[in-house]
Amino acid sequence: MENNDTGVAESVFIGGMFVLYGSQYADILEHYGRLAGMSDAEIASEAASVRAEIGQVSKAVKTAGWDGEWFVRAYDAYSRKVGTHEDTEGQIYIEPQGMCVMAGIGLDDGKAQQALKSVKERLTCDWGTAILAPAYSTYRIELGEISSYPRG
């Protein structure tokens, strides 16, 4: 097996970033669009378009990106979940939990609260918060560098 750069992998973490920063972009448009020479109609149209895309990505993250108790990290180039309870290693990653919660994904249905609870239970210890758990025991070429991180 080799690392497959097909461009079809999808990151739930990046989906959360899109929702968070897309929302901020829409707010910036509404507050400062006139200073950029935009008309009120252009501002309203662009902000509505951005918010519609945000809604679609947020919905996709809540459905395809939810693993039951936390957000998955991604789907690899073979459409396999990365960061799922279905695997024996690398079940949960910190990045999508924080990013999706900061973006407000799952605040309305308890997913955000559950994701943070899972972080506390599965990633947090006396020395801080781990990047992922459980750590990978061998290098996985399809995942790359993240599979070489030591425990903790």
Describe the residue ranges of each PLM region:
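Acidic, mature catalytic/reactive cores of soluble proteins
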Residues: M1-G152
